[in-house]
């Protein structure tokens, strides 16, 4: 999302962390924006709408950005993430297709287990981040970013055609479902009231198809992008408003928008594609080496492996790091300097942390400046201020795992 102007500025939260092409006030939008199945629901609940990645989405509701953020950390919030691209990869060669595009080990995923992975190019750059789930229904369920919708879809469709021309059994289907994210420490408790399945048996990055508050055919995945426990629910369009309404009846739940989602993911040290990672960033530079499957590293059979794998054993020129500072908040594009005042890097995302009451950011610096505790300078509003390289996540994550 952009350093969005007027509408967002009046809300007291500047979406400077988001990529310029993605988010802006509706008054600035020239194209016809797409609407999620919950568009009227958002308006009825006081949603303040902005243009994001070609969609009209709520940046916040009646509560302040800070209140929404803290409510998610302490209770739970409901987010509409229906703008994200949901696809099914079908056929007996579905794993072969996906492993030809991503860095992760898809073949070793158990039924209904998922993983965060990366589309990469032959130069080692990251084309997008995505979640791939090996469903027990015999297909791969893929969720990727709205801002990369056309690029990701074309990438997968081209590979489908290539493999089909080789006689391979593979296909692709775009899902028309809505996608709701219920995030926060009480999310599972809230959802349990509406499902027969025991959510204690659904750990982080696993999923199951179930009826949720009377809506059948929902895929519930224990994941999210806030650092908290939570789920993402892929729901048939016809049941989306009913499901959101049913969840919102619980007093634990409040609606939250793009502003809270961005500050929550930043506190959790999670990347925003287009800002923190892009086609010119490798997984090693982006501190995402953990996404590289062990078998895939050894085989060097993913796009860009000849660039990426040697970086694991050697040194890269720069790394993504966390930063904390007092004073004015660091924003995307703020210059990072060493203590001698020489520019050495750039902030890619930044905001005041409602949880820590400090300013947090992430950015890229040369490896010799990447050790936690290293003191640096950040230029904010033409003034230099002290910043310290900090471990991420900035706040502890609370993902649910089986004991």
From Swiss-Prot:
Coiled coil: none annotated. Its EC number is 2.1.2.10. The keyword Transferase applies. GO terms for molecular function: aminomethyltransferase activity; transaminase activity. One of its GO terms (biological process) is glycine decarboxylation via glycine cleavage system. GO terms for cellular component: glycine cleavage complex; mitochondrial matrix; mitochondrion; nucleoplasm. InterPro entries: GCS_T (IPR006223), GCST_C (IPR013977), GCV_T_N (IPR006222), GcvT/YgfZ/DmdA (IPR028896), GcvT/YgfZ_C (IPR029043), TrmE/GcvT_dom1 (IPR027266). Residues 1-28 form a transit peptide. It is an enzyme of class 2 (transferase). The keyword ATP-binding does not apply. Pfam families: GCV_T, GCV_T_C. It is found in: Mitochondrion. Changing residue 320 to H: In GCE2; loss of aminomethyltransferase activity. Changing residue 145 to I: In GCE2; loss of aminomethyltransferase activity. It comes from the Eukaryota. Substrate binds at residues 232, 261, 399. It catalyses: N(6)-[(R)-S(8)-aminomethyldihydrolipoyl]-L-lysyl-[protein] + (6S)-5,6,7,8-tetrahydrofolate = N(6)-[(R)-dihydrolipoyl]-L-lysyl-[protein] + (6R)-5,10-methylene-5,6,7,8-tetrahydrofolate + NH4(+). Keywords: Aminotransferase, Disease variant, Mitochondrion, Transferase, Transit peptide. It is linked to Glycine encephalopathy 2: A form of glycine encephalopathy, a metabolic disorder characterized by a high concentration of glycine in the body fluids. Affected individuals typically have severe neurological symptoms, including seizure, lethargy, and muscular hypotonia soon after birth. Most of them die within the neonatal period. Atypical cases have later disease onset and less severely affected psychomotor development. The glycine cleavage system is composed of four proteins: P, T, L and H. The glycine cleavage system catalyzes the degradation of glycine. Belongs to the GcvT family. This is Aminomethyltransferase, mitochondrial. It comes from Homo sapiens.
């Amino acid at each position: 999302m952009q350093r969005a102007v007027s509408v967002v500025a009046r809300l007291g939260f500047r979406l400077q962390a988001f990529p310029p092409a993605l988010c802006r006030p509706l008054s600035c939008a020239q194209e016809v924006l797409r609407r999620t199945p919950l568009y009227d629901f958002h308006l009825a609940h006081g949603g303040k709408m902005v243009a994001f990645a070609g969609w009209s989405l709520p940046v916040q509701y009646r509560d302040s950005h800070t209140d929404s953020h803290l409510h998610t950390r302490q209770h739970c919030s409901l987010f509409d993430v229906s703008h994200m691209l949901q696809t099914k990869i079908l056929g007996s060669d579905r794993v072969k297709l996906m492993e030809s595009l991503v860095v992760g080990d898809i073949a070793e995923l158990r039924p209904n287990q998922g993983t965060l992975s990366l589309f990469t190019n032959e130069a080692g750059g990251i084309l997008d981040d995505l979640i791939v789930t090996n469903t027990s229904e015999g297909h791969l369920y893929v969720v990727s970013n709205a801002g990369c919708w056309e690029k990701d879809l074309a990438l997968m469709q081209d590979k489908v055609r290539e493999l089909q021309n080789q006689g391979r059994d593979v296909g692709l289907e775009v899902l028309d479902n809505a996608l709701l994210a219920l995030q926060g420490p009480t999310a599972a408790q809230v959802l349990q009231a509406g499902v027969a399945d025991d959510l204690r048996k659904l750990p982080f990055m696993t999923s199951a198809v179930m009826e949720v508050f009377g809506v059948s055919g929902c895929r519930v995945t224990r994941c999210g992008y806030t650092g908290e426990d939570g789920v993402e629910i892929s729901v048939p369009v016809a049941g989306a408003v009913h499901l959101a309404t049913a969840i919102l009846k619980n007093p634990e739940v409040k609606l939250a928008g793009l502003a809270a989602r961005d500050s929550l993911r930043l506190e959790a040290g999670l990347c925003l594609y287009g800002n923190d990672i892009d086609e010119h960033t490798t997984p090693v530079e982006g501190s995402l080496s953990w996404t590289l499957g062990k078998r895939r590293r050894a085989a060097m059979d993913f796009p860009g492996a000849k660039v990426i794998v040697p970086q694991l054993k050697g040194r890269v020129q720069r790394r993504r790091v966390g930063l904390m500072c007092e004073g004015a908040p660091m924003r995307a594009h703020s210059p990072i300097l060493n203590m001698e005042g020489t520019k050495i890097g750039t902030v890619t995302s930044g905001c005041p942390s409602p949880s820590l009451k400090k300013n947090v950011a992430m950015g890229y610096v040369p490896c010799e400046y990447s050790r936690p505790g290293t003191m640096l300078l950040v230029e904010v509003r033409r003034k230099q201020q002290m910043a310290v390289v900090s471990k991420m996540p900035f706040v502890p994550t609370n993902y649910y795992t089986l004991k």
